[in-house]
A protein has these predicted regions:
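Secreted/extracellular ectodomain signature
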Residues: 1-139
Length: 139
């Protein structure tokens, strides 16, 4: 991101432009989906070139999104700034990510918005499972 200095740490966030059924109760299913997508050069060669491990902003009955992504203010600390791939800041840290209001909407890896009005993550704006509505709970 252009606002950072060499050596600064940060996170990137994007919405996949393809979807998967939210029927699995295993958070690793969603992490694998997002990781395989991000590291597939046919979808986005720049993302794939980063060669990093990606996790889903998703909650199941067993795992909350803030824990799955290492952005839990209590256990992971203040965190770092989070940016969209187009250089827009999304959140200034873990507290900002989960305070119910992010600076910019999360876009797809192409920079656009999904035509669907809502992306189901099974999570509340606080990054915890939406009680009874976590991924894999509704078929």
């Amino acid at each position: 991101p252009s606002r950072l200095n060499p050596g600064d740490t940060y996170r990137l966030v994007f919405e996949t432009s393809i979807s998967t059924a939210a029927t699995s109760t295993d958070i690793n299913f969603y992490n694998t989906f997002v990781n395989d997508f991000a590291n597939n050069a046919s979808f986005n060669p720049v993302l794939a070139s980063l060669g990093t491990t990606w996790t889903a902003i998703a909650s199941t009955a067993a795992v909350d999104a803030q824990d799955n992504t290492g952005t839990n203010l209590t256990t992971d600390g203040a965190g770092v700034s989070i940016y969209h791939l187009n250089d827009q800041i999304v959140a200034t840290g873990n507290a900002d990510l989960w305070d119910g209001s992010i600076a910019n909407l999360i876009r797809s890896e192409t920079g656009g918005f999904d035509a669907a009005p809502v992306v189901w993550t099974g999570s509340t704006a606080a990054g915890v499972e939406s009680i009874g509505l976590g991924l894999g709970r509704i078929n």
